[in-house]
């Protein structure tokens, strides 16, 4: 496999930098109403050391009445405990990292439809600028965003 030309490499770098620029936080705290619910769940897991409200195995997947999926919440509490980051710092890193993964993942996915570099780049740019994706990835912690990004 030959390496891409310098113009294509710089185009991908610019796409990544533009994605980072769009996700730069403009508020002093995370946004979204569900966000604070998931933050309190992660803090409860950290302080108690267990998921005390998940009594059924289906609760972990959000398939039991009154529960929500715990994958992203468990990941957040595990990473903040292991690294010593605050939950807010983790959410910022989480949203930026997943937005980069999903933007470049969409670039690779569009490569299945066309071999034209410009079309792939433009499709990834449009995905990165989509209003719903922007609201999910702007300093927000949501299991839906984790599912969409991956």
Regions found by a protein language model. Give the residues of each.
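Membrane-embedded, hydrophobic transmembrane alpha-helices
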Residues: 1-5
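Active-site lumenal/periplasmic loops and adjacent helix-entry segments of GT-C-fold
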Residues: 8-11, 17-149
């Amino acid at each position: 496999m030959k390496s891409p030309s310098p113009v294509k490499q710089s185009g991908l770098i610019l796409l990544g930098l533009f994605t980072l620029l769009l996700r730069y936080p403009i508020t002093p705290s995370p946004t979204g109403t569900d966000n604070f619910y998931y933050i309190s769940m992660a803090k409860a897991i950290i302080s108690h050391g267990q998921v005390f409200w998940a009594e059924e195995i289906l609760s972990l997947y959000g398939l039991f009445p009154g529960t929500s999926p715990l994958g992203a919440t468990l990941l957040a509490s595990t990473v903040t405990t292991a690294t010593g980051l605050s939950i807010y710092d983790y959410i910022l890193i989480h949203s930026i990292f997943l937005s980069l993964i999903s933007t470049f993942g969409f670039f690779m996915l569009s490569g299945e439809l066309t071999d034209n570099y410009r079309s792939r780049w433009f499709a990834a740019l449009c995905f990165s600028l989509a209003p719903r994706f922007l609201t999910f990835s702007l300093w927000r912690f949501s299991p839906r965003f984790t599912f969409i990004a991956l």
